Amino acid sequence: MAPLTLDLLAQLPEAYQLYAPTVDVLPLIPLLFFLLVFVWQAAVGFR
């Protein structure tokens, strides 16, 4: 059981290489929301 589990874990990163560009962008999403809130507040005059 253990060797099978380790083998599966070793193969998962290779299987997800297709999604590497998306994963690189994911940490920026909260920053985009922060920027959106700032622009929105600037548009309404920081009420």
Curated annotation (Swiss-Prot):
Keywords: Membrane, Photosynthesis, Photosystem II, Reaction center, Thylakoid, Transmembrane, Transmembrane helix. It is found in: Cellular thylakoid membrane. Its main location: membrane. Disulfide bonds: none annotated. The keyword Cell wall biogenesis/degradation does not apply. The keyword GTP-binding does not apply. SUPFAM superfamilies: Photosystem II reaction center protein K, PsbK. It comes from the Bacteria. The chain crosses the membrane at residues 26-46. It is a single-pass membrane protein. Residues 1-10 form a propeptide. One of its GO terms (cellular component) is plasma membrane-derived thylakoid membrane. One of its GO terms (biological process) is photosynthesis. PSII is composed of 1 copy each of membrane proteins PsbA, PsbB, PsbC, PsbD, PsbE, PsbF, PsbH, PsbI, PsbJ, PsbK, PsbL, PsbM, PsbT, PsbX, PsbY, Psb30/Ycf12, peripheral proteins PsbO, CyanoQ (PsbQ), PsbU, PsbV and a large number of cofactors. It forms dimeric complexes. Belongs to the PsbK family. One of the components of the core complex of photosystem II (PSII). PSII is a light-driven water:plastoquinone oxidoreductase that uses light energy to abstract electrons from H(2)O, generating O(2) and a proton gradient subsequently used for ATP formation. It consists of a core antenna complex that captures photons, and an electron transfer chain that converts photonic excitation into a charge separation. This is Photosystem II reaction center protein K. It comes from Prochlorococcus marinus (strain SARG / CCMP1375 / SS120). The gene is psbK.
